């Protein structure tokens, strides 16, 4: 009977904190109302959430260039989640952003106030060596409660980790580790050789260059929304795997490559190709960074390849021009979205001497989307060939 009363109280409190179509829960009240052990295990460290989903912050010093990146990271998260940011040095729960004299890029996991009953205090976020907007989104994601993707409790299903470094150990599933699929391309993933060569390899080696990429993914924001209980009272009929955006309930959050309020539009300056038969067609497409409001610091050019209904679209790369080969392909690269879940990051290519450059990519998606991304104004280009087939053809 006591547990039933606690459960009813928790439900009442949950609905009492829903406003403007969004759910922003006060974890203190829920914990006080419904605290039996099973729920504590399920929502482990729930007290590290920011109260009502509001992140209070202030700058401890000045650096206009870094501050601009911080503000862009804040805007990106706010535009895709119900999390709100408030610049307030005197808030009882706040993060101090330090941009000088530290040469670090790091943050504590979770909000200040580790006790459920006292969500107060201050933590520091060090951002002087954060060199991309995605890196700062990574640190804010820590502050919001996310651990690294490579420490998920299910990571051994996707990676072989041999390092004994303490920070690489698997984490329990209580935070945002299990609110969406494992993703090698997550902004929360380190590059494969962070702890030394061969210490953190993906089981699918085509993903090795993808690990450590600093584009913010569809699932990166989805997991935050799931963890904070972000939702809209009215759900839109979003297309292509999108969902109603808890930042603005009149539009959808869309997977990469889909645009418009309902995710049913394509990029205006995109390339649209038709695979007309099973003969290979070749094309070279240029791409480069250009400023775009609300971006994660990268600009993407999208290619849409359409084939015959129920056919397989095959794509193979023939050349990369001025695409910079780095761990994590962090400057520019090519992503052919061929995975069954088109919302998840497929293997990224930026090196001609490493997998999966020589692969024949086979996709059942119609259209199949290719993303050419860059954060440099240096003109780059990719040459590839494509076709459709009803057979699983392997090039010799």
From Swiss-Prot:
Residues 225-264 form the EGF-like domain. PROSITE patterns: ASTACIN, EGF_1, EGF_2, ZINC_PROTEASE. Binds 1 zinc ion per subunit. GO terms for biological process: molting cycle, collagen and cuticulin-based cuticle; proteolysis. Keywords: Disulfide bond, EGF-like domain, Glycoprotein, Hydrolase, Metal-binding, Metalloprotease, Protease, Secreted, Signal, Zinc, Zymogen. Zn(2+) binds at residues 138, 142, 148. GO terms for cellular component: extracellular region. InterPro entries: MetalloPept_cat_dom_sf, Metallopeptidase_nem, Peptidase_M12A, Peptidase_Metallo. GO terms for molecular function: metalloendopeptidase activity; zinc ion binding. Metalloprotease. This is Zinc metalloproteinase nas-19. It comes from Caenorhabditis elegans. The lineage of its organism: Eukaryota, Metazoa, Ecdysozoa, Nematoda, Chromadorea.
């Amino acid at each position: 009977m006591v547990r039933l009363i606690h459960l009813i109280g928790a439900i009442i409190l949950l609905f009492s904190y829903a406003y403007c179509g969004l759910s922003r829960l006060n974890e203190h009240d829920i914990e006080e109302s419904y605290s039996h052990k099973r729920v504590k295990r399920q929502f482990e460290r729930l007290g590290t959430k920011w109260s009502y989903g509001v992140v209070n912050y202030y700058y401890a010093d000045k650096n206009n260039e870094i501050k601009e990146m911080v503000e862009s990271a804040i805007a990106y998260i706010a535009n895709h989640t119900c999390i709100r940011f408030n610049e307030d040095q005197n808030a009882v729960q706040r993060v101090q952003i330090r941009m000088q004299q530290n040469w670090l890029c790091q943050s504590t996991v979770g909000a200040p106030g580790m006790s459920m009953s006292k969500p107060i205090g201050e933590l520091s976020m060090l951002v002087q060596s954060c060199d991309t907007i995605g890196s700062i989104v990574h640190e804010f994601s820590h502050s919001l409660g996310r651990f690294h993707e490579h420490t998920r409790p299910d990571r051994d299903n996707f990676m072989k980790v041999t390092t004994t470094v303490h920070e690489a150990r698997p984490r329990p599933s209580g935070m945002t580790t299990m609110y969406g699929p494992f993703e090698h391309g997550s902004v929360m993933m380190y590059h494969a050789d962070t702890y030394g060569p061969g210490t953190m390899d993906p089981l699918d080696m085509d993903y090795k260059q993808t690990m450590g990429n600093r584009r913010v993914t569809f699932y990166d924001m989805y997991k935050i929304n799931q963890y904070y209980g972000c939702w809209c009272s009215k759900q839109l009929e979003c297309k292509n795997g999108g969902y109603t955006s808890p930042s603005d309930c009149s539009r959808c959050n869309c997977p990469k490559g889909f645009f418009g309020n309902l995710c049913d539009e394509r990029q205006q300056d995109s390339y649209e190709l038709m695979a007309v038969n099973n003969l290979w067609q070749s094309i070279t497409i240029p791409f480069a960074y250009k400023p775009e409001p609300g971006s994660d610091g990268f600009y993407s050019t999208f290619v849409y390849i359409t084939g015959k209904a129920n056919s397989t679209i095959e794509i193979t790369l023939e050349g990369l021009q001025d695409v910079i080969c780095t761990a994590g392909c962090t400057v520019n690269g090519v992503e052919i979205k061929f995975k069954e879940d088109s919302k998840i990051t497929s293997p990224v290519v930026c090196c001609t001497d490493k997998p999966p450059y020589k692969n024949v990519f086979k996709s059942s998606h119609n259209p199949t989307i290719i993303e050419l991304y860059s954060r440099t104004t240096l003109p780059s280009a990719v040459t590839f060939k494509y076709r459709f087939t009803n057979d699983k053809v392997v090039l010799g």
